[in-house]
Amino acid sequence: MITKPDKNVIRKKRHNRVRRTLSGTAERPRLNVYRSNKNIYAQLIDDNAGVTVASASTADKELAIGGGNVESAKQVGAAIAKRAIDKGYKSIVFDRGGYLYHGRIKALAEAAREEGLEF
């Protein structure tokens, strides 16, 4: 019997391969994206200190307004960019988390760029 491999296992392998070379610093934190079935989460992470600098998600009360999945991702991207700029971060490293740069991930990244983040 042929079994299909679990998509999340493949994504995690892909993410680990990318993470070997990708790292966030205090000057240029890593923007990590996680996509679940219901929500999308974004974190700015300083990997040297092991600290989350800022975060935003559709689980936040002010961002849980709704709309479509892509519209919600745009709101999260704008919110994480605003929070990053408020804390003094203009340039970041984008970590798509092993997901394809398409749909919700692309919408979040483009909204963050429109708000002024550079990556």
Swiss-Prot record:
Any Gene Ontology biological process: translation
GO cellular component, one term: cytosolic large ribosomal subunit
InterPro entries, per database record: Ribosomal_uL18_bac-type, Ribosomal_uL18_bac/euk
Protein's UniProt keywords contain Chaperone: no
Family matches, as Pfam families: Ribosomal_L18p
Swiss-Prot/TrEMBL keywords: Ribonucleoprotein, Ribosomal protein, RNA-binding, rRNA-binding
GO MF assignments: 5S rRNA binding; structural constituent of ribosome
Assembly and oligomerization: Part of the 50S ribosomal subunit; part of the 5S rRNA/L5/L18/L25 subcomplex. Contacts the 5S and 23S rRNAs.
Family under the similarity heading: Belongs to the universal ribosomal protein uL18 family.
Entry function: This is one of the proteins that bind and probably mediate the attachment of the 5S RNA into the large ribosomal subunit, where it forms part of the central protuberance.
Entries under PANTHER family matching the protein: 39S RIBOSOMAL PROTEIN L18, MITOCHONDRIAL, LARGE RIBOSOMAL SUBUNIT PROTEIN UL18M
HAMAP family to which the protein is assigned, alphabetical: Ribosomal_uL18_B
Protein name: Large ribosomal subunit protein uL18
Organism, as annotated: Oceanobacillus iheyensis (strain DSM 14371 / CIP 107618 / JCM 11309 / KCTC 3954 / HTE831)
